[in-house]
UniProtKB/Swiss-Prot annotation:
This is Glucose-methanol-choline family oxidoreductase mfmG. Its cofactor is FAD. Its EC number is 1.1.-.-. SUPFAM superfamilies: FAD-linked reductases, C-terminal domain, FAD/NAD(P)-binding domain. PANTHER family: DEHYDROGENASE PKFF-RELATED, GLUCOSE-METHANOL-CHOLINE GMC OXIDOREDUCTASE. Oxidoreductase; part of the gene cluster that mediates the biosynthesis of the phthalide-terpenoid hybrid 11'-O-desmethylfendlerol. MfmG seems not to be involved directly in the biosynthesis of 11'-O-desmethylfendlerol and its role has still to be determined. The biosynthesis of 11'-O-desmethylfendlerol begins with the NR-PKS mfmB that forms 3,5-dimethylorsellinic acid (DMOA), which is then transformed into the phthalide 5,7-dihydroxy-4-(hydroxymethyl)-6-methylphthalide by the cytochrome P450 monooxygenase mfmA and the hydrolase mfmC. FAD binds at T44, A45, E65, A66, N126, F127, M128, A129, A572, P584, Q585. Homodimer. Belongs to the GMC oxidoreductase family. The keyword Glycoprotein applies.
Amino acid sequence: MYMLRPSSLLLATGLLNQGSSVLAAVISRASNQTFDYVIVGGGTAGLVLANRLTEDSSVTVAVVEAGTFPEDVVGNVTQVPAYAPQFEGAELDLEWNFTTTPQAGLGNIPVSYYRAKALGGCSDINFMAYGRTSKGAHQLWADLVGDDSYTYDNMVKYYKKTMNFSPPNAETRLANATPMYDTVDTSTGGGIDVTFPSFAQSWSTWVSKGLAAIGLPQAHSFVDGNLLGHSWQMVGITQSTGIRSSAQAGYLRPVMSRPNLTILNGTFAERIIFNGDAASGVEVTAKGQTYTLTSKKELILSAGVFQSPQLLMVSGVGPKALLDKFNIPVVKDLPGVGQNMVDHITVPLSYQVDVVTSSTLAGSSLEEAITEWNTHGTGPLSNNGGDYIGMEKAPAEFRANFSAETVKQLSALPEDWPELQYNVLPATVSSTSIGGEGSVLGGNYGSMLASVIAPQSRGNVSIASASMSDAPLINPNIFTAQADIDLLLTAFKRVRQALQSSAMAPIMIGDEFFPGPTVQTDEQILDYLTETVRPFSHGFATCKMGKSSDPDAVIDSHGKVYGIKNLRVVDASSFPFLPPGPAPQIQVYTLAEKLADDIKQTKY
Protein backbone atom coordinates (compact mmCIF):
# COMPACT_ATOMS: atom_id res chain seq x y z
CA MET A 1 0.00 0.00 0.00
CA TYR A 2 1.05 3.63 -0.38
CA MET A 3 1.82 5.14 2.98
CA LEU A 4 3.13 8.40 4.28
CA ARG A 5 6.68 8.17 5.47
CA PRO A 6 7.52 11.55 7.01
CA SER A 7 11.28 11.79 7.37
CA SER A 8 10.83 14.37 10.11
CA LEU A 9 9.01 11.81 12.21
CA LEU A 10 11.70 9.22 11.69
CA LEU A 11 14.23 11.63 13.13
CA ALA A 12 12.12 12.61 16.10
CA THR A 13 11.88 9.35 17.97
CA GLY A 14 14.62 10.24 20.38
CA LEU A 15 12.52 13.11 21.69
CA LEU A 16 9.79 10.78 22.89
CA ASN A 17 9.65 9.22 26.31
CA GLN A 18 10.83 5.68 25.77
CA GLY A 19 8.39 2.94 26.72
CA SER A 20 9.51 0.22 29.09
CA SER A 21 10.89 -2.94 27.54
CA VAL A 22 11.22 -4.85 30.82
CA LEU A 23 8.36 -7.12 29.76
CA ALA A 24 10.86 -8.98 27.62
CA ALA A 25 12.48 -10.22 30.81
CA VAL A 26 9.48 -12.44 31.56
CA ILE A 27 9.50 -14.13 28.17
CA SER A 28 10.32 -17.82 28.43
CA ARG A 29 13.19 -19.63 26.73
CA ALA A 30 12.43 -22.38 24.25
CA SER A 31 13.00 -25.99 25.35
CA ASN A 32 11.33 -29.37 24.91
CA GLN A 33 8.00 -28.82 26.62
CA THR A 34 4.42 -30.06 26.60
CA PHE A 35 1.30 -27.89 26.66
CA ASP A 36 -2.41 -28.38 26.12
CA TYR A 37 -2.36 -25.90 23.24
CA VAL A 38 0.53 -24.58 21.18
CA ILE A 39 -0.23 -21.46 19.13
CA VAL A 40 2.16 -20.68 16.28
CA GLY A 41 2.14 -16.90 15.85
CA GLY A 42 1.73 -14.20 18.48
CA GLY A 43 -0.09 -11.74 16.27
CA THR A 44 -3.58 -10.32 15.99
CA ALA A 45 -5.34 -13.70 16.19
CA GLY A 46 -2.81 -15.68 18.21
CA LEU A 47 -2.84 -13.36 21.22
CA VAL A 48 -6.64 -13.31 21.34
CA LEU A 49 -6.59 -17.10 21.50
CA ALA A 50 -3.85 -17.12 24.14
CA ASN A 51 -5.82 -14.71 26.32
CA ARG A 52 -9.14 -16.53 26.06
CA LEU A 53 -7.82 -20.09 26.37
CA THR A 54 -5.80 -19.30 29.51
CA GLU A 55 -8.92 -17.94 31.22
CA ASP A 56 -9.22 -21.58 32.29
CA SER A 57 -6.42 -21.93 34.83
CA SER A 58 -6.26 -25.69 34.28
CA VAL A 59 -5.23 -25.21 30.64
CA THR A 60 -1.63 -24.58 29.56
CA VAL A 61 -0.85 -22.56 26.44
CA ALA A 62 2.38 -21.71 24.62
CA VAL A 63 2.70 -18.99 22.00
CA VAL A 64 5.54 -19.33 19.48
CA GLU A 65 6.57 -15.95 18.05
CA ALA A 66 9.57 -15.12 15.86
CA GLY A 67 9.54 -11.48 16.96
CA THR A 68 9.37 -9.77 20.31
CA PHE A 69 7.71 -6.70 21.80
CA PRO A 70 8.06 -3.85 19.30
CA GLU A 71 9.33 -1.62 22.12
CA ASP A 72 12.45 -3.79 22.24
CA VAL A 73 13.14 -2.94 18.59
CA VAL A 74 12.11 0.71 18.12
CA GLY A 75 11.33 2.04 21.60
CA ASN A 76 7.81 3.41 21.91
CA VAL A 77 7.51 4.57 18.31
CA THR A 78 4.83 1.98 17.46
CA GLN A 79 2.70 3.33 20.29
CA VAL A 80 2.43 6.77 18.65
CA PRO A 81 -0.54 6.78 16.23
CA ALA A 82 0.94 9.38 13.87
CA TYR A 83 4.02 7.21 13.32
CA ALA A 84 2.00 4.37 11.77
CA PRO A 85 2.86 5.44 8.20
CA GLN A 86 6.60 5.04 8.60
CA PHE A 87 6.85 1.29 9.03
CA GLU A 88 6.20 -0.09 5.55
CA GLY A 89 9.53 -0.69 3.86
CA ALA A 90 11.50 0.64 6.83
CA GLU A 91 13.57 -2.58 6.90
CA LEU A 92 13.49 -2.79 10.67
CA ASP A 93 13.62 -6.09 12.56
CA LEU A 94 9.94 -5.49 13.14
CA GLU A 95 8.87 -6.82 9.75
CA TRP A 96 9.51 -9.84 7.58
CA ASN A 97 10.36 -7.54 4.64
CA PHE A 98 8.62 -9.76 2.11
CA THR A 99 8.67 -9.04 -1.62
CA THR A 100 6.19 -10.43 -4.11
CA THR A 101 7.02 -12.29 -7.27
CA PRO A 102 6.98 -10.10 -10.42
CA GLN A 103 3.40 -8.94 -10.89
CA ALA A 104 1.95 -9.36 -14.38
CA GLY A 105 -0.62 -6.63 -13.77
CA LEU A 106 2.10 -4.14 -12.84
CA GLY A 107 4.41 -4.60 -15.78
CA ASN A 108 6.19 -7.61 -14.25
CA ILE A 109 7.72 -5.77 -11.32
CA PRO A 110 7.83 -7.14 -7.76
CA VAL A 111 6.49 -5.01 -4.90
CA SER A 112 7.16 -4.97 -1.17
CA TYR A 113 4.54 -6.54 1.06
CA TYR A 114 4.74 -5.67 4.69
CA ARG A 115 3.98 -8.16 7.48
CA ALA A 116 4.92 -7.56 11.09
CA LYS A 117 7.34 -9.77 12.98
CA ALA A 118 6.41 -8.90 16.55
CA LEU A 119 4.16 -9.80 19.44
CA GLY A 120 0.93 -8.19 18.33
CA GLY A 121 1.58 -8.74 14.65
CA CYS A 122 0.32 -6.14 12.20
CA SER A 123 -1.80 -4.54 14.93
CA ASP A 124 1.52 -3.01 16.09
CA ILE A 125 2.19 -1.17 12.84
CA ASN A 126 -1.04 -0.71 10.88
CA PHE A 127 -3.36 2.30 10.73
CA MET A 128 -5.52 1.08 13.63
CA ALA A 129 -8.80 1.37 11.70
CA TYR A 130 -11.74 -0.23 13.50
CA GLY A 131 -14.97 -1.23 11.76
CA ARG A 132 -17.19 -4.18 11.06
CA THR A 133 -18.00 -5.75 7.73
CA SER A 134 -21.48 -5.68 6.20
CA LYS A 135 -24.51 -7.76 7.13
CA GLY A 136 -24.68 -9.13 3.61
CA ALA A 137 -21.02 -10.18 3.71
CA HIS A 138 -21.72 -12.11 6.91
CA GLN A 139 -24.68 -13.87 5.30
CA LEU A 140 -22.50 -14.82 2.33
CA TRP A 141 -19.86 -16.12 4.76
CA ALA A 142 -22.45 -18.27 6.54
CA ASP A 143 -23.76 -19.60 3.23
CA LEU A 144 -20.32 -20.45 1.84
CA VAL A 145 -19.21 -22.37 4.93
CA GLY A 146 -22.61 -23.87 5.77
CA ASP A 147 -22.74 -22.42 9.27
CA ASP A 148 -25.31 -19.84 10.40
CA SER A 149 -23.17 -18.88 13.39
CA TYR A 150 -21.37 -16.54 10.96
CA THR A 151 -24.42 -14.37 10.23
CA TYR A 152 -24.13 -10.77 11.38
CA ASP A 153 -26.60 -11.12 14.24
CA ASN A 154 -24.73 -14.14 15.59
CA MET A 155 -21.32 -12.46 15.28
CA VAL A 156 -22.22 -9.17 17.01
CA LYS A 157 -21.40 -10.60 20.44
CA TYR A 158 -17.89 -11.39 19.26
CA TYR A 159 -17.44 -7.96 17.72
CA LYS A 160 -18.38 -6.50 21.07
CA LYS A 161 -15.87 -8.72 22.89
CA THR A 162 -13.11 -6.99 20.93
CA MET A 163 -14.18 -3.44 21.87
CA ASN A 164 -13.59 -1.20 24.89
CA PHE A 165 -15.12 2.02 23.58
CA SER A 166 -14.54 5.57 24.82
CA PRO A 167 -16.53 8.47 23.31
CA PRO A 168 -14.62 11.11 21.31
CA ASN A 169 -13.03 14.00 23.18
CA ALA A 170 -15.22 16.92 22.14
CA GLU A 171 -12.91 19.40 23.90
CA THR A 172 -9.90 18.60 21.72
CA ARG A 173 -11.56 17.79 18.39
CA LEU A 174 -12.61 20.46 15.91
CA ALA A 175 -16.16 21.71 16.33
CA ASN A 176 -17.07 20.46 12.85
CA ALA A 177 -15.53 17.02 13.45
CA THR A 178 -18.23 15.38 15.54
CA PRO A 179 -18.59 11.69 14.63
CA MET A 180 -21.96 10.01 14.26
CA TYR A 181 -22.46 6.60 15.88
CA ASP A 182 -25.09 4.72 17.87
CA THR A 183 -24.18 3.62 21.38
CA VAL A 184 -26.06 0.35 20.81
CA ASP A 185 -23.26 -0.60 18.41
CA THR A 186 -20.49 0.03 20.93
CA SER A 187 -19.38 -1.86 24.02
CA THR A 188 -16.94 -1.62 26.91
CA GLY A 189 -14.76 -4.19 28.60
CA GLY A 190 -13.43 -5.78 25.40
CA GLY A 191 -9.84 -6.39 24.40
CA ILE A 192 -9.05 -3.32 22.27
CA ASP A 193 -9.45 0.30 23.34
CA VAL A 194 -11.50 2.01 20.63
CA THR A 195 -12.30 5.69 20.17
CA PHE A 196 -11.94 8.54 17.69
CA PRO A 197 -8.58 10.37 17.69
CA SER A 198 -8.42 13.30 20.10
CA PHE A 199 -7.08 15.37 17.21
CA ALA A 200 -9.12 15.67 14.00
CA GLN A 201 -7.40 16.56 10.74
CA SER A 202 -8.63 19.81 9.16
CA TRP A 203 -8.08 18.18 5.77
CA SER A 204 -10.62 15.50 6.71
CA THR A 205 -13.34 18.03 7.52
CA TRP A 206 -13.08 19.29 3.95
CA VAL A 207 -12.93 15.82 2.43
CA SER A 208 -16.21 15.06 4.19
CA LYS A 209 -17.75 17.95 2.24
CA GLY A 210 -16.30 16.65 -1.01
CA LEU A 211 -17.63 13.14 -0.49
CA ALA A 212 -21.06 14.50 0.37
CA ALA A 213 -20.95 16.66 -2.77
CA ILE A 214 -20.56 13.60 -5.01
CA GLY A 215 -23.47 11.82 -3.37
CA LEU A 216 -22.15 9.68 -0.54
CA PRO A 217 -24.55 9.65 2.45
CA GLN A 218 -23.46 10.20 6.04
CA ALA A 219 -22.70 6.89 7.77
CA HIS A 220 -22.55 5.93 11.44
CA SER A 221 -18.88 5.04 11.85
CA PHE A 222 -19.17 1.64 10.15
CA VAL A 223 -19.90 -0.40 13.27
CA ASP A 224 -23.55 -1.13 12.51
CA GLY A 225 -23.24 -3.53 9.59
CA ASN A 226 -23.71 -0.75 7.01
CA LEU A 227 -20.67 0.26 4.96
CA LEU A 228 -22.16 2.60 2.38
CA GLY A 229 -21.40 6.27 2.98
CA HIS A 230 -18.72 8.46 4.56
CA SER A 231 -17.73 8.87 8.19
CA TRP A 232 -15.08 9.67 10.73
CA GLN A 233 -13.07 6.55 11.46
CA MET A 234 -13.02 4.69 14.77
CA VAL A 235 -9.51 3.59 15.68
CA GLY A 236 -7.73 1.34 18.15
CA ILE A 237 -6.32 4.05 20.42
CA THR A 238 -6.52 4.51 24.18
CA GLN A 239 -8.43 7.76 24.69
CA SER A 240 -6.71 8.79 27.94
CA THR A 241 -3.14 8.37 26.68
CA GLY A 242 -3.30 8.69 22.90
CA ILE A 243 -1.43 5.37 22.62
CA ARG A 244 -2.06 2.66 20.02
CA SER A 245 -4.14 -0.23 21.35
CA SER A 246 -2.77 -3.39 19.75
CA ALA A 247 -3.21 -7.12 20.29
CA GLN A 248 -0.19 -7.22 22.57
CA ALA A 249 -1.34 -4.17 24.53
CA GLY A 250 -4.97 -5.24 24.84
CA TYR A 251 -4.85 -9.03 24.93
CA LEU A 252 -1.35 -10.01 26.10
CA ARG A 253 0.00 -7.50 28.60
CA PRO A 254 -3.01 -7.72 30.96
CA VAL A 255 -2.51 -11.51 31.32
CA MET A 256 1.28 -11.83 31.18
CA SER A 257 1.37 -13.00 34.80
CA ARG A 258 -0.87 -16.02 34.22
CA PRO A 259 1.24 -19.06 35.17
CA ASN A 260 -0.46 -21.19 32.51
CA LEU A 261 0.67 -18.91 29.66
CA THR A 262 4.14 -19.28 28.12
CA ILE A 263 5.42 -16.83 25.52
CA LEU A 264 8.33 -18.05 23.40
CA ASN A 265 9.63 -15.02 21.52
CA GLY A 266 12.54 -15.14 19.12
CA THR A 267 11.36 -18.66 18.32
CA PHE A 268 10.72 -19.93 14.79
CA ALA A 269 8.32 -22.71 13.86
CA GLU A 270 10.03 -25.10 11.45
CA ARG A 271 7.76 -28.12 10.99
CA ILE A 272 4.50 -29.56 12.25
CA ILE A 273 4.93 -32.93 13.95
CA PHE A 274 2.35 -35.57 13.09
CA ASN A 275 1.35 -38.82 14.72
CA GLY A 276 -0.44 -40.52 11.86
CA ASP A 277 -3.22 -38.18 10.74
CA ALA A 278 -3.07 -36.08 13.91
CA ALA A 279 -0.90 -33.06 14.71
CA SER A 280 0.99 -33.63 17.94
CA GLY A 281 3.26 -30.61 18.13
CA VAL A 282 5.73 -28.40 16.34
CA GLU A 283 9.48 -28.35 15.86
CA VAL A 284 10.95 -24.92 16.61
CA THR A 285 14.34 -23.23 16.66
CA ALA A 286 15.61 -20.53 18.99
CA LYS A 287 19.13 -19.14 19.05
CA GLY A 288 20.37 -21.93 16.83
CA GLN A 289 18.90 -24.74 18.91
CA THR A 290 16.06 -27.05 17.88
CA TYR A 291 13.28 -28.02 20.27
CA THR A 292 9.99 -29.89 20.21
CA LEU A 293 6.81 -28.41 21.63
CA THR A 294 4.16 -31.07 22.16
CA SER A 295 0.47 -30.15 22.03
CA LYS A 296 -1.72 -32.52 24.04
CA LYS A 297 -4.98 -31.10 22.69
CA GLU A 298 -4.40 -28.92 19.64
CA LEU A 299 -1.82 -27.17 17.54
CA ILE A 300 -3.19 -23.84 16.28
CA LEU A 301 -1.61 -21.98 13.37
CA SER A 302 -1.93 -18.20 13.63
CA ALA A 303 1.19 -17.39 11.63
CA GLY A 304 -0.62 -15.21 9.10
CA VAL A 305 -1.69 -15.22 5.50
CA PHE A 306 1.73 -16.29 4.19
CA GLN A 307 3.36 -18.37 6.88
CA SER A 308 0.39 -20.47 7.99
CA PRO A 309 0.08 -22.02 4.50
CA GLN A 310 3.87 -22.16 4.20
CA LEU A 311 4.16 -24.12 7.45
CA LEU A 312 1.43 -26.49 6.31
CA MET A 313 3.16 -27.10 2.99
CA VAL A 314 6.70 -27.68 4.30
CA SER A 315 5.14 -30.09 6.81
CA GLY A 316 3.38 -32.16 4.14
CA VAL A 317 -0.10 -30.63 3.98
CA GLY A 318 -0.88 -28.98 0.65
CA PRO A 319 -0.96 -29.58 -3.12
CA LYS A 320 0.63 -32.99 -3.74
CA ALA A 321 2.45 -31.97 -6.92
CA LEU A 322 4.16 -29.09 -5.13
CA LEU A 323 5.13 -31.26 -2.15
CA ASP A 324 6.53 -33.92 -4.48
CA LYS A 325 8.63 -31.25 -6.23
CA PHE A 326 10.51 -30.63 -2.99
CA ASN A 327 10.51 -34.27 -1.81
CA ILE A 328 8.23 -33.44 1.10
CA PRO A 329 6.39 -36.54 2.38
CA VAL A 330 2.67 -36.01 1.81
CA VAL A 331 0.63 -36.12 5.00
CA LYS A 332 -2.52 -34.76 3.36
CA ASP A 333 -3.12 -33.69 -0.22
CA LEU A 334 -5.01 -30.40 0.16
CA PRO A 335 -4.93 -28.48 -3.15
CA GLY A 336 -6.35 -25.28 -1.63
CA VAL A 337 -3.43 -24.60 0.72
CA GLY A 338 -1.85 -21.32 -0.39
CA GLN A 339 -4.51 -20.63 -3.03
CA ASN A 340 -7.27 -18.00 -3.26
CA MET A 341 -5.14 -15.10 -2.04
CA VAL A 342 -6.95 -11.79 -2.36
CA ASP A 343 -6.06 -8.21 -1.41
CA HIS A 344 -7.47 -4.73 -1.71
CA ILE A 345 -5.67 -2.39 -4.12
CA THR A 346 -5.08 1.36 -4.01
CA VAL A 347 -3.61 4.41 -5.75
CA PRO A 348 -3.02 7.94 -4.40
CA LEU A 349 -3.95 11.45 -5.55
CA SER A 350 -2.40 14.56 -3.93
CA TYR A 351 -3.17 18.30 -3.89
CA GLN A 352 -1.68 21.42 -2.32
CA VAL A 353 -4.19 22.80 0.17
CA ASP A 354 -4.82 25.87 2.30
CA VAL A 355 -5.20 24.03 5.62
CA VAL A 356 -2.51 22.77 7.96
CA THR A 357 -1.62 19.12 7.37
CA SER A 358 1.06 16.71 8.55
CA SER A 359 3.21 17.59 5.54
CA THR A 360 4.52 20.61 7.46
CA LEU A 361 4.83 18.86 10.82
CA ALA A 362 8.53 19.50 11.33
CA GLY A 363 10.94 21.60 13.38
CA SER A 364 9.34 23.57 16.21
CA SER A 365 5.82 22.42 15.33
CA LEU A 366 6.90 18.80 15.65
CA GLU A 367 8.63 19.51 18.96
CA GLU A 368 5.42 21.08 20.24
CA ALA A 369 3.43 18.08 19.06
CA ILE A 370 5.80 15.68 20.82
CA THR A 371 5.49 17.64 24.05
CA GLU A 372 1.70 17.65 23.83
CA TRP A 373 1.52 13.93 23.15
CA ASN A 374 3.94 13.07 25.95
CA THR A 375 2.09 15.34 28.39
CA HIS A 376 -1.56 14.87 27.48
CA GLY A 377 -1.79 12.16 24.83
CA THR A 378 -3.42 14.66 22.47
CA GLY A 379 -2.45 16.77 19.46
CA PRO A 380 -1.34 15.78 15.94
CA LEU A 381 0.62 12.73 17.11
CA SER A 382 -2.56 11.22 18.57
CA ASN A 383 -4.06 11.01 15.07
CA ASN A 384 -3.31 8.00 12.86
CA GLY A 385 -3.42 10.05 9.64
CA GLY A 386 -6.35 8.16 8.15
CA ASP A 387 -9.23 9.47 10.24
CA TYR A 388 -11.90 9.77 7.54
CA ILE A 389 -13.22 7.25 5.05
CA GLY A 390 -15.89 6.80 2.39
CA MET A 391 -17.24 3.67 0.72
CA GLU A 392 -19.72 3.13 -2.09
CA LYS A 393 -20.78 0.97 -4.99
CA ALA A 394 -19.73 2.27 -8.38
CA PRO A 395 -22.43 4.72 -9.59
CA ALA A 396 -24.63 3.75 -12.54
CA GLU A 397 -22.96 6.12 -15.00
CA PHE A 398 -19.66 4.29 -14.46
CA ARG A 399 -21.16 0.80 -14.36
CA ALA A 400 -22.50 1.39 -17.85
CA ASN A 401 -18.91 1.17 -19.11
CA PHE A 402 -17.99 -2.02 -17.24
CA SER A 403 -17.23 -5.20 -19.15
CA ALA A 404 -19.83 -7.96 -19.17
CA GLU A 405 -17.50 -10.11 -17.06
CA THR A 406 -17.13 -7.32 -14.50
CA VAL A 407 -20.90 -6.90 -14.24
CA LYS A 408 -21.35 -10.65 -13.80
CA GLN A 409 -18.73 -10.92 -11.05
CA LEU A 410 -19.95 -7.90 -9.11
CA SER A 411 -23.58 -9.00 -9.34
CA ALA A 412 -22.66 -12.07 -7.28
CA LEU A 413 -21.79 -9.88 -4.29
CA PRO A 414 -24.34 -8.84 -1.65
CA GLU A 415 -26.16 -5.58 -2.31
CA ASP A 416 -24.57 -3.94 0.74
CA TRP A 417 -20.97 -4.84 -0.26
CA PRO A 418 -19.20 -1.59 -1.29
CA GLU A 419 -16.81 -1.81 -4.21
CA LEU A 420 -14.88 1.44 -3.82
CA GLN A 421 -13.16 3.01 -0.82
CA TYR A 422 -11.72 6.49 -0.27
CA ASN A 423 -9.20 7.17 2.52
CA VAL A 424 -7.72 10.50 3.58
CA LEU A 425 -4.02 11.11 4.15
CA PRO A 426 -2.85 14.51 5.46
CA ALA A 427 0.31 14.83 3.35
CA THR A 428 1.62 14.22 -0.16
CA VAL A 429 1.91 10.78 -1.67
CA SER A 430 3.87 10.23 -4.87
CA SER A 431 5.62 7.44 -6.69
CA THR A 432 9.05 8.68 -5.69
CA SER A 433 8.55 10.12 -2.23
CA ILE A 434 5.93 8.78 0.11
CA GLY A 435 4.91 11.76 2.20
CA GLY A 436 6.47 14.26 4.51
CA GLU A 437 8.11 16.48 1.90
CA GLY A 438 5.87 19.49 2.56
CA SER A 439 8.67 21.33 4.33
CA VAL A 440 10.85 20.83 1.23
CA LEU A 441 8.20 21.60 -1.37
CA GLY A 442 6.74 24.46 0.63
CA GLY A 443 3.15 24.45 1.78
CA ASN A 444 0.59 21.96 2.99
CA TYR A 445 -0.60 18.96 1.02
CA GLY A 446 -3.49 16.55 1.33
CA SER A 447 -4.09 13.21 -0.35
CA MET A 448 -6.73 10.59 -0.85
CA LEU A 449 -6.38 6.92 -1.66
CA ALA A 450 -8.69 5.53 -4.34
CA SER A 451 -9.17 1.85 -3.56
CA VAL A 452 -10.99 -1.29 -4.66
CA ILE A 453 -12.57 -3.36 -1.88
CA ALA A 454 -14.38 -5.86 -4.10
CA PRO A 455 -11.28 -7.21 -5.88
CA GLN A 456 -11.69 -10.13 -8.28
CA SER A 457 -8.00 -10.90 -8.94
CA ARG A 458 -6.80 -14.02 -7.13
CA GLY A 459 -3.25 -14.98 -6.30
CA ASN A 460 -1.41 -17.59 -4.28
CA VAL A 461 1.35 -18.34 -1.83
CA SER A 462 3.80 -21.12 -2.56
CA ILE A 463 7.08 -22.42 -1.21
CA ALA A 464 10.60 -22.01 -2.56
CA SER A 465 11.95 -25.04 -0.73
CA ALA A 466 11.14 -27.52 2.00
CA SER A 467 12.42 -25.09 4.64
CA MET A 468 10.71 -22.32 6.57
CA SER A 469 14.03 -20.47 6.43
CA ASP A 470 13.36 -19.59 2.80
CA ALA A 471 10.76 -16.87 2.29
CA PRO A 472 7.46 -17.98 0.76
CA LEU A 473 6.71 -17.14 -2.86
CA ILE A 474 4.02 -14.47 -2.70
CA ASN A 475 1.96 -13.79 -5.80
CA PRO A 476 -1.09 -11.60 -5.04
CA ASN A 477 -1.62 -11.36 -8.82
CA ILE A 478 -3.10 -7.89 -8.35
CA PHE A 479 -4.68 -5.83 -11.10
CA THR A 480 -5.12 -8.75 -13.46
CA ALA A 481 -8.92 -9.13 -13.37
CA GLN A 482 -10.81 -6.78 -15.69
CA ALA A 483 -13.21 -6.01 -12.83
CA ASP A 484 -10.35 -4.57 -10.78
CA ILE A 485 -9.26 -2.40 -13.69
CA ASP A 486 -12.81 -1.14 -14.22
CA LEU A 487 -13.29 -0.46 -10.52
CA LEU A 488 -9.96 1.26 -9.88
CA LEU A 489 -10.48 3.53 -12.88
CA THR A 490 -13.85 4.44 -11.39
CA ALA A 491 -12.42 5.00 -7.91
CA PHE A 492 -9.75 7.30 -9.33
CA LYS A 493 -12.33 9.38 -11.18
CA ARG A 494 -14.62 9.55 -8.15
CA VAL A 495 -11.82 10.85 -5.94
CA ARG A 496 -11.08 13.51 -8.52
CA GLN A 497 -14.76 14.47 -8.57
CA ALA A 498 -14.74 14.88 -4.79
CA LEU A 499 -11.48 16.81 -4.57
CA GLN A 500 -12.34 19.06 -7.52
CA SER A 501 -15.91 19.73 -6.34
CA SER A 502 -17.09 23.24 -5.53
CA ALA A 503 -17.41 22.15 -1.90
CA MET A 504 -13.63 21.80 -1.64
CA ALA A 505 -12.65 24.71 -3.87
CA PRO A 506 -12.04 27.17 -0.98
CA ILE A 507 -8.94 25.26 0.20
CA MET A 508 -7.46 23.93 -3.05
CA ILE A 509 -4.30 25.60 -4.37
CA GLY A 510 -3.45 25.20 -8.03
CA ASP A 511 -3.74 22.07 -10.13
CA GLU A 512 -3.54 18.52 -8.93
CA PHE A 513 -0.05 17.83 -7.55
CA PHE A 514 0.01 14.08 -8.19
CA PRO A 515 -0.44 12.49 -10.65
CA GLY A 516 -1.13 15.90 -12.18
CA PRO A 517 -3.38 17.54 -14.77
CA THR A 518 -1.65 15.89 -17.73
CA VAL A 519 -3.23 12.56 -16.73
CA GLN A 520 -6.70 12.95 -18.24
CA THR A 521 -7.74 10.35 -20.80
CA ASP A 522 -8.70 6.82 -19.79
CA GLU A 523 -5.53 5.58 -21.48
CA GLN A 524 -3.38 8.01 -19.48
CA ILE A 525 -5.16 7.14 -16.25
CA LEU A 526 -4.76 3.41 -16.88
CA ASP A 527 -1.04 3.92 -17.50
CA TYR A 528 -0.83 5.73 -14.17
CA LEU A 529 -2.80 3.01 -12.40
CA THR A 530 -0.58 0.26 -13.79
CA GLU A 531 2.57 2.10 -12.70
CA THR A 532 1.27 3.07 -9.28
CA VAL A 533 -1.29 0.58 -7.94
CA ARG A 534 -0.19 -1.37 -4.89
CA PRO A 535 -1.72 -3.98 -2.59
CA PHE A 536 -3.08 -2.72 0.72
CA SER A 537 -1.23 -5.52 2.58
CA HIS A 538 -4.65 -6.94 3.46
CA GLY A 539 -3.92 -10.46 2.21
CA PHE A 540 -6.57 -13.04 3.11
CA ALA A 541 -7.97 -16.52 2.44
CA THR A 542 -4.88 -18.65 1.70
CA CYS A 543 -6.18 -21.40 4.02
CA LYS A 544 -9.74 -20.90 2.92
CA MET A 545 -12.67 -21.81 5.14
CA GLY A 546 -15.38 -23.75 3.32
CA LYS A 547 -17.60 -26.77 3.08
CA SER A 548 -16.06 -30.22 2.67
CA SER A 549 -17.48 -30.26 -0.87
CA ASP A 550 -15.41 -27.19 -1.81
CA PRO A 551 -12.21 -28.44 -3.49
CA ASP A 552 -10.35 -25.28 -2.46
CA ALA A 553 -11.37 -25.42 1.21
CA VAL A 554 -8.57 -26.03 3.71
CA ILE A 555 -10.48 -25.68 6.98
CA ASP A 556 -14.07 -26.15 8.11
CA SER A 557 -16.17 -23.52 9.86
CA HIS A 558 -14.49 -24.39 13.17
CA GLY A 559 -11.03 -23.70 11.77
CA LYS A 560 -10.12 -27.40 11.69
CA VAL A 561 -7.88 -28.56 8.86
CA TYR A 562 -9.63 -31.10 6.67
CA GLY A 563 -8.26 -34.61 7.07
CA ILE A 564 -5.98 -33.74 10.00
CA LYS A 565 -6.90 -34.13 13.65
CA ASN A 566 -5.97 -31.62 16.37
CA LEU A 567 -4.89 -28.91 13.92
CA ARG A 568 -6.60 -25.56 13.31
CA VAL A 569 -5.80 -22.40 11.41
CA VAL A 570 -7.05 -19.14 12.94
CA ASP A 571 -5.85 -15.93 11.28
CA ALA A 572 -6.35 -13.87 8.12
CA SER A 573 -5.68 -16.93 5.98
CA SER A 574 -8.75 -18.67 7.45
CA PHE A 575 -11.45 -16.56 5.82
CA PRO A 576 -13.50 -17.69 2.80
CA PHE A 577 -12.98 -14.24 1.27
CA LEU A 578 -11.60 -10.80 2.06
CA PRO A 579 -14.51 -8.98 3.74
CA PRO A 580 -15.20 -5.34 2.89
CA GLY A 581 -14.85 -2.62 5.50
CA PRO A 582 -12.56 0.16 6.72
CA ALA A 583 -9.81 -2.44 7.33
CA PRO A 584 -9.95 -6.19 7.96
CA GLN A 585 -8.07 -6.22 11.29
CA ILE A 586 -11.26 -6.24 13.35
CA GLN A 587 -12.52 -9.26 11.40
CA VAL A 588 -9.42 -11.20 12.47
CA TYR A 589 -9.90 -10.23 16.13
CA THR A 590 -13.54 -11.24 15.91
CA LEU A 591 -12.90 -14.60 14.25
CA ALA A 592 -10.32 -15.40 16.93
CA GLU A 593 -12.83 -14.54 19.66
CA LYS A 594 -15.39 -16.84 18.06
CA LEU A 595 -13.07 -19.77 17.50
CA ALA A 596 -11.61 -19.41 21.01
CA ASP A 597 -15.10 -20.18 22.29
CA ASP A 598 -15.31 -23.11 19.89
CA ILE A 599 -11.99 -24.53 21.08
CA LYS A 600 -13.05 -24.21 24.72
CA GLN A 601 -16.21 -26.19 24.00
CA THR A 602 -14.40 -28.99 22.15
CA LYS A 603 -14.31 -32.35 23.92
CA TYR A 604 -11.06 -34.27 23.61
